[in-house]
From Swiss-Prot:
It comes from the Eukaryota. Belongs to the DPH3 family. Component of the 2-(3-amino-3-carboxypropyl)histidine synthase complex composed of DPH1, DPH2, DPH3 and a NADH-dependent reductase, predominantly CBR1. Its main location: cytoplasm. GO terms for cellular component: cytosol; nucleus. Gene3D superfamilies: DPH Zinc finger. Keywords: Cytoplasm, Iron, Metal-binding, Nucleus, Oxidoreductase. This is Diphthamide biosynthesis protein 3. The DPH-type metal-binding (MB) domain can also bind zinc. However, iron is the physiological binding partner as zinc binding impairs the protein electron donor function. Coiled coil: none annotated. GO terms for biological process: protein histidyl modification to diphthamide; tRNA wobble base 5-methoxycarbonylmethyl-2-thiouridinylation.
């Protein structure tokens, strides 16, 4: 599978209402991926208007702050308890 680019999670925009990360696509639309898909290990964001895809670079524990921002609990624990 060929990806258009690799993008750090910090460079994406997170919408707590839709729980989607987005990033501008060259076609004018936006790549998108849901936080729950990322929690399940998915790292490919797709553009709904064209065939381009990007790889999102992140660590699983990075997602906790975005779940907190959305006011929801992750479907699985993101940080090992001590």
């Amino acid at each position: 599978m060929s990806v258009y680019d690799e993008v750090e999670i910090e460079d994406m925009t997170f919408d707590p209402d839709t729980q989607l990360f987005t990033y501008p696509c060259p076609c004018g639309d936006r790549f998108q991926i849901s936080i729950d898909d990322m929690c399940d290990g998915e790292d490919i964001a797709v553009c709904p208007s064209c065939s381009l895809m990007i790889k999102v670079v992140y660590e699983l524990h990075d997602l906790q702050e975005y779940y907190d921002e959305a006011g929801v609990e992750p479907p699985v624990p993101l940080v090992a308890s001590a």
